[in-house]
Amino acid sequence: MMSYIALAACIGLAMAANVDHDVKSAVNEVTTTKDGDTYCPVPLVGTKCGTSSIFHYWKCCGELNKECCFNLQTWVWVTLALFGVIFIASFVISLVRCICCRK
């Protein structure tokens, strides 16, 4: 019986360590800013991209990665999504209060 408990504990610890790594990498991706590419596809021959900021970065895209594409940083997308969820939730709550709390 103890061997089964020890085996279950080892499996649980292994899975928890893997989940911990996944959570850390997800948090790290959201909280870091990307520098982006400065030339697409390579310096001297490629197109010069703009400079990146804390709000956006440039990424090579298009046919043969010859064009510079504008991308928002991950934290900007998370913030916009959070504001969207808060806005929709407050709208729904206000609508429910208006319908249910009439005098």
From Swiss-Prot:
Membrane topology (UniProt): Single-pass type I membrane protein
InterPro entries for this protein: SUP-1-like (IPR022559)
Record field: transmembrane: 76-96
GO cellular component, one term: neuron projection
Alphabetical UniProt keywords: Cell membrane, Cell projection, Cytoplasmic vesicle, Membrane, Signal, Synapse, Transmembrane, Transmembrane helix
Side of membrane Cytoplasmic, spans: 97-103
Expression sites (tissue/organ): Expressed in a subset of neurons and in body wall muscles. In the nervous system, expressed specifically in cholinergic motor neurons of the ventral nerve cord, a subset of cholinergic head neurons, anterior sublateral neurons, and body sublateral neurons (at protein level).
A Pfam family matched in the record: DUF2650
Signal peptide span: 1-16
Disruption phenotype annotation: Mild decrease in swimming behavior but otherwise no apparent phenotype.
The UniProt record lists the keyword Cell membrane: yes
Record function comment: May be involved in trafficking or stabilization of the vesicular acetylcholine transporter unc-17.
PANTHER family reported in the protein's UniProt record: PROTEIN CBG11905-RELATED, PROTEIN SUP-1
Protein name, UniProt field: Protein SUP-1
Native organism: Caenorhabditis elegans
Organism phylogeny: Eukaryota, Metazoa, Ecdysozoa, Nematoda, Chromadorea
Designated gene of the protein: sup-1
